[in-house]
């Protein structure tokens, strides 16, 4: 059985790491552009664009507009401030990207506790442990090969926190054998590693941008390859030449159980939600497990399904499921 975990920023936040875009922007506001010697003129232009960005963000916040709290959406819309100055945008993007990497690098040395490691290991070993008894029986009845769980992870984060957990949790071997006394069976768990769909800190640059051209508000920039190479994440991944897009799409296409943890399911990663939708519709036996953290909706009643219903609707909306597909 192929079990695929997609991990988002909610994972780092649950660890207590200040990795929200709002945390970074507070840091970025106080940084002086530093592109290197001989580029002082570009640095002055960047500073002006930065001031305009924060001014416009403040105005939108006063009007109660929530969309720009997502920095990637904000970047796509802020392109209108540059007119036809594509080089100016590329310099601005470079400065922000480098600053984001510098900021997150401060929190990239995470050492999990033994208790956290054991919990992580159990989560991978028993992917159905979060299901109710009825759902667990349904999973066991599915026509999957349950003698071996192949575990793959796709991280949407830049930090290596999830890899630190897995590296320690599966320190002795990438393959483990487990028995289920309750159900009189056993199986092997094979950990296959982590794919970083947006790049990894200290590994040749990170991807910060949008999913497709329509999310770039500046019409001229939609036709500009220099901008698209940076701002369009699928094109940026292609330029990096790592084949990570193809590898991750293949993992989704072959997954029997897809677990989504800490993901906002926002529009700037729409290609991945579309791929999950395709897998789900192509194979009705595929199971989607979505961990939606909403502490405001917690209830002491285990039959209060409001939180579950809202999470399900959020997933349905993100995948674009319609009618009977739901």
Question: Which stretches of residues belong to each language-model region?
Answer:
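Conserved Rossmann-like nucleotide-cofactor binding loop
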Residues: 12
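Glycine-centered secondary-structure boundary/capping sites
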Residues: 16, 209, 319-323
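Active-site periphery "cap/insert" segments of enzyme catalytic domains
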Residues: 2-6, 15, 19, 23, ...
């Amino acid at each position: 059985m192929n079990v695929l975990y997609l991990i988002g920023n909610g994972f780092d936040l649950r660890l207590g790491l200040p990795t929200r875009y709002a945390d970074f922007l507070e840091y970025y506001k106080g940084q002086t552009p530093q592109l290197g010697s001989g580029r002082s003129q570009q640095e002055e232009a960047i500073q002006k664009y930065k001031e305009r960005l924060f001014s416009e963000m403040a105005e939108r916040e006063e009007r109660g507009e929530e969309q720009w709290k997502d920095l990637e959406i904000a970047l796509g819309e802020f392109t209108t401030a540059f007119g036809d100055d594509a080089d100016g945008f590329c310099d601005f993007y470079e400065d922000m990207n480098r600053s984001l990497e510098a900021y997150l690098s401060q929190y990239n040395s995470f050492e999990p506790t033994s208790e956290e490691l054991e919990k992580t290991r159990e989560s991978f070993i028993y992917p159905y442990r979060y299901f109710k008894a009825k759902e667990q029986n349904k999973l066991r009845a599915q026509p999957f090969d349950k003698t071996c769980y192949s575990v793959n992870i796709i991280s949407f984060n830049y930090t290596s926190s999830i890899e630190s957990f897995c590296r320690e949790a599966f320190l002795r071997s990438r393959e483990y054998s487990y028995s289920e006394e309750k159900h009189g069976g056993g199986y092997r768990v094979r950990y296959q590693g982590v794919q970083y769909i947006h790049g990894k800190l200290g590994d040749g640059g990170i991807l910060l941008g949008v999913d497709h051209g329509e999310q770039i508000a500046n019409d001229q920039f939609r036709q500009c390859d220099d901008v698209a190479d940076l701002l369009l994440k699928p094109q940026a991944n292609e330029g990096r030449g790592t084949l990570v897009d193809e590898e991750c799409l293949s993992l989704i296409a072959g997954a029997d159980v897809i677990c989504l943890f800490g993901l906002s399911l926002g529009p700037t990663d729409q290609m991945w939600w579309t791929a999950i939708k395709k897998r789900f519709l192509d194979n009705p036996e595929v199971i989607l497990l979505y961990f939606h953290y909403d502490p405001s909706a917690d209830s002491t009643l285990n039959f209060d399904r409001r939180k579950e219903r809202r999470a399900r609707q959020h997933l349905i909306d993100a995948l674009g499921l319609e009618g009977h597909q739901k």
